[in-house]
């Protein structure tokens, strides 16, 4: 897996509202982490998940993604989730990088 942490990474294909609901439920069951954009990080502050923000816009997200993936193992989580990014513009570069790190594992909600 390309630039993948040892911790399992799973992508969630959903809108923001369903993603937040899914994370809130998963955080009740096990120790989880999430890698999200800054706006999503704010909505997950009280979820019980360990939250890693990779930036406030697509450019910073693309720039910070590998560093954030490497920091995942330090969280001590059972699993880490990320929402599947938009495939438009620079989002496509983020998509291509993170899907490889997740070993192409996607949950569609």
Regions found by a protein language model. Name each.
Residues 1-103, 107:
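A C-terminal functional module that forms or caps the active site or interfaces directly
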């Amino acid at each position: 897996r390309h630039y993948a942490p040892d911790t399992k990474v799973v992508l969630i294909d959903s809108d923001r509202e369903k993603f937040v609901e899914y994370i809130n439920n998963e955080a009740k069951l096990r120790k989880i982490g999430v890698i999200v954009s800054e706006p999503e990080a704010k909505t997950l502050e009280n979820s019980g998940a360990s939250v890693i923000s990779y930036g406030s816009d697509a450019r910073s997200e693309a720039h910070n993604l590998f560093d954030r993936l490497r920091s995942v193992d330090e969280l001590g989580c059972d699993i880490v989730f990320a929402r599947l990014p938009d495939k438009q513009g620079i989002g496509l570069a983020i998509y291509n990088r993170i899907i490889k790190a997740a070993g192409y594992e996607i949950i569609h909600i």
